[in-house]
């Protein structure tokens, strides 16, 4: 595959490299507001790359990809290769690397950080999805090479990628509908015109789950890294997300207790695009706190409570409503039950 990426910042002067990983159906364009804002700081180099089968990362002409799966494992390997061979080889040996991911990109950031510990110093999760992939192993006939499956999928695919449906899906996940611009819709639809797009779509949804670690194992590994190796973890979630609701952020915060957790409101599933000024301020504050300042309290005190009409709230993880309280009780009860049964 030809891997497309963009970079803003001075490779020679940067002390921290932030690599943004996008969600399903979008690409590098979803992070241009972060690249433009952060790349102007000579201490930071901001990157965004398109995962294979998304954005502008597609097979080269004549490339044989019959056995290639568009899956968490393949994307994990792609990100690791990108960090090692592109980012680190072009930088000084003392730089820090932070992965920042939205939705699918958030889970991918978790997966890479939990399995390639030597190349990451921190992660920032932006409404990271806790689920991706439903099959335990590959089903032989459910492949992108099966022409019957391709023909069967075609009507659904054509409707799924239509302008009307893309707009409808965006209205579900953006709290501020005025942020749904025509250029965003066009950027999402453009990659679906690739001749290989429908096969990548089929492969994406028929490929197995991540094989190395389950989601819970990823969290446990990151928790251990955070507690024992000074690995940095932060969450920056849009509170009005109808898919990855705040409850999921609360769950993650309960596992990784030292994680810094900010909630933005009003903001939906893609805060990086919908409320970029607030996200950029949070990311810059986190980088200052983690790598450029010894005074955490003083850094946080400079972060505004509201930017461009969006509130920025530091959340401690305590349950705030009946749903979060029930979920907290359930987790606590199950944990105690498991502890007593193993004793």
Name every feature range the model reports, one short phrase each:
Residues 107, 111-114, 119-155:
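Flexible "cap/lid" loop of the alpha/beta hydrolase fold
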Residues 25, 51-55, 130, 268-271:
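Alpha/beta-hydrolase active-site loop signature
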Residues 19-23, 102, 237:
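The conserved beta1-alpha1 loop
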Residues 1, 6-12, 42-100, 281:
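Active-site loop/oxyanion-hole signature of alpha/beta-hydrolase fold enzymes
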Residues 197-254, 263:
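Conserved serine/cysteine hydrolase catalytic core
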Residues 164-179, 187-192, 203-210:
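Helix-loop "lid/cap" segments that line or gate small-molecule binding pockets
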Residues 23-33, 46:
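Serine-hydrolase catalytic-loop signature spanning alpha/beta hydrolases and amidase-signature enzymes
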Residues 250, 255-343:
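Catalytic active-site module of serine/aspartate enzymes centered on a nucleophile-bearing elbow/loop
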């Amino acid at each position: 595959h030809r891997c497309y990426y963009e970079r803003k910042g001075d490779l020679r002067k940067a002390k921290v490299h932030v690599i943004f990983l996008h969600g399903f159906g979008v690409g590098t364009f979803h992070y241009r507001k972060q690249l433009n804002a952060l790349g102007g700081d000579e201490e930071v180099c901001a990157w965004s790359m398109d995962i294979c089968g998304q954005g502008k990362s597609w097979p080269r002409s004549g490339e044989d990809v019959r056995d290639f799966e568009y899956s968490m494992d393949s994307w994990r390997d792609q990100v690791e290769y990108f960090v090692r061979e592109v980012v680190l080889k072009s930088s000084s040996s003392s730089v820090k690397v932070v992965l920042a991911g939205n939705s699918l990109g958030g889970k991918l950031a978790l997966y890479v950080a939990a399995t390639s510990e030597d190349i990451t110093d921190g992660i920032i999760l932006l409404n990271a999805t806790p689920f991706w992939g439903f099959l335990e192993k590959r089903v032989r006939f459910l492949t992108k090479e099966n022409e019957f499956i391709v023909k069967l999928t075609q009507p659904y695919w054509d409707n799924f990628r239509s302008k009307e449906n893309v707009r409808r899906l965006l209205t579900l996940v953006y709290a501020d509908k005025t942020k749904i611009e025509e250029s965003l819709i066009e950027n999402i639809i453009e990659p679906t015109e690739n001749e290989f797009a429908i096969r990548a779509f089929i492969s994406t949804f028929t490929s197995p789950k991540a094989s190395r670690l389950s989601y819970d194992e990823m969290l446990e590994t990151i928790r251990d890294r955070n507690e024992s190796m000074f690995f940095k973890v932060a969450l920056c979630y849009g509170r009005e997300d109808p898919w990855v609701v705040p409850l999921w952020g609360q769950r993650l915060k309960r596992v990784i207790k030292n994680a810094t957790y900010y909630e933005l409101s009003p903001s939906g599933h893609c805060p990086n695009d919908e409320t970029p000024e607030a996200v950029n301020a949070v990311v810059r504050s986190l980088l200052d706190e983690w790598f450029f300042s010894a005074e955490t309290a003083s850094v946080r005190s400079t972060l505004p409570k509201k930017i461009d009409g969006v509130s920025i709230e530091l959340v401690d993880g305590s349950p705030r409503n009946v749903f979060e309280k029930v979920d907290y009780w359930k987790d606590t009860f199950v944990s105690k039950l498991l502890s007593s049964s193993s004793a």
